[in-house]
C-alpha cells in the first residue's frame, strides 16, 4: 500500500459522548477496519479520536463517529488532517 493511500486525521466529537461506551465502541470499529490511533475523553466533554489507516477505512470510521454507539447523542464531529506525526502502533482507549 502506498503512503498516499493512507489517511491520518484527528477528530473531535461533541454531544453526549462520555459515559456511553463511545471510546470503547470506537476502538471496536477501528480494530474491525484495521485503523490505528486512540480515543480519549477531553475535560470539556468531547471525545478526541486520532485515526490512521487506509483512506477508505478512515472515512468509514469518520462516518461511524457521527452516530457512535446507541446511547450516544452526537451533535458535531470536526476533523483535521494530521501531518508530520508518527503513525500509532495500535488503537488505544485513553
Swiss-Prot record:
SUPFAM superfamilies: Acylphosphatase/BLUF domain-like. Its EC number is 3.6.1.7. It is an enzyme of class 3 (hydrolase). One of its GO terms (molecular function) is acylphosphatase activity. It comes from the Bacteria. Residues 8-94 form the Acylphosphatase-like domain. This is Acylphosphatase.
